[in-house]
A protein has these predicted regions:
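Structured helix-beta-strand junction loops
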Residues: 30-31, 66-67, 92
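Alpha-helix/helix-capping structural signal
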Residues: 7-8, 39, 77, 119
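Acidic, PIN/NYN-like endoribonuclease modules and their adjacent C-terminal/linker elements
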Residues: 1, 108-139
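Ribonuclease/tRNase effector modules and their secretory precursors
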Residues: 50-51, 67, 77
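Active-site neighborhoods of divalent-metal-dependent phosphate/nucleic-acid chemistry enzymes
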Residues: 70-116
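Short, conserved active-site loops that position catalytic residues or coordinate cofactors/metal ions
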Residues: 37-43
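Short, well-structured N-terminal submotif of metal-dependent ribonuclease cores
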Residues: 1-36, 49-62, 127-128, 138-139
Length: 139
C-alpha cells in the first residue's frame, strides 16, 4: 500500500524527470493498492497534458480506469481535515493535494508516500509520533 503524490507520479511517468528510474521502480514494486487523492489526480492530469500532450493525459487516465491506482473518495469532513492540516503547516505553504495525502494516510493507516517533495512530507506528521516514509528517498 502506497500513497502517491504528484511529483512522484510525474517523475515515474517522464524519463527526463529527476529520479525517474527510482520513482518508476518504487511505483512498480509497491504492493497495491496505489492510493491517489482526487486532488493529486487533478494536478497530475493537468501537468501530464501540459508537458506530454493530450494523448499522454488520456493514457494516464486510462490507468485510473484500469484501476492501476485506487482513487480515494474525499468528502466534506475530509476537506475540513485537510484545511486543518493546511492551517497547521501554513508557513510551509502546504496545499490541498499534500494535505489530502496526510488525510488519506490516517484513513488507510499507512505512512509510505511516493514523492520528491521532502520539504513538506518531512514536516507533516500524519499521526502523533509518526513520520512519512518517503519513497524513493527512504527506500
Amino acid at each position: 500500500l502506497i500513497l502517491v503524490d504528484t511529483s512522484g507520479i510525474l517523475s515515474a511517468l517522464f524519463p527526463d524527470q529527476n529520479r525517474h528510474h527510482e520513482c518508476a521502480q518504487a511505483l512498480l514494486s509497491a504492493t497495491p493498492p496505489r492510493i491517489i487523492s482526487p486532488f493529486v489526480l487533478a494536478e497530475v492530469a493537468y501537468l501530464v497534458q501540459k508537458f506530454g500532450g493530450v494523448d499522454a493525459e488520456i493514457l494516464f487516465l486510462a490507468e485510473i480506469g484500469r484501476r492501476a491506482y485506487e482513487l480515494a473518495a474525499f468528502d466534506e469532513d475530509d476537506v475540513e481535515d485537510a484545511r486543518q492540516i493546511i492551517h497547521k503547516y501554513r508557513t510551509l505553504g502546504v496545499g490541498l493535494a499534500d494535505a489530502s495525502i496526510a488525510v488519506l494516510s490516517k484513513r488507510y493507516d499507512t505512512f509510505d508516500v511516493l514523492t520528491l517533495d521532502e520539504r513538506h512530507f518531512r514536516a507533516i506528521r500524519p499521526a502523533p509520533r509518526k513520520n512519512f516514509r518517503i519513497l524513493p528517498a527512504d527506500g
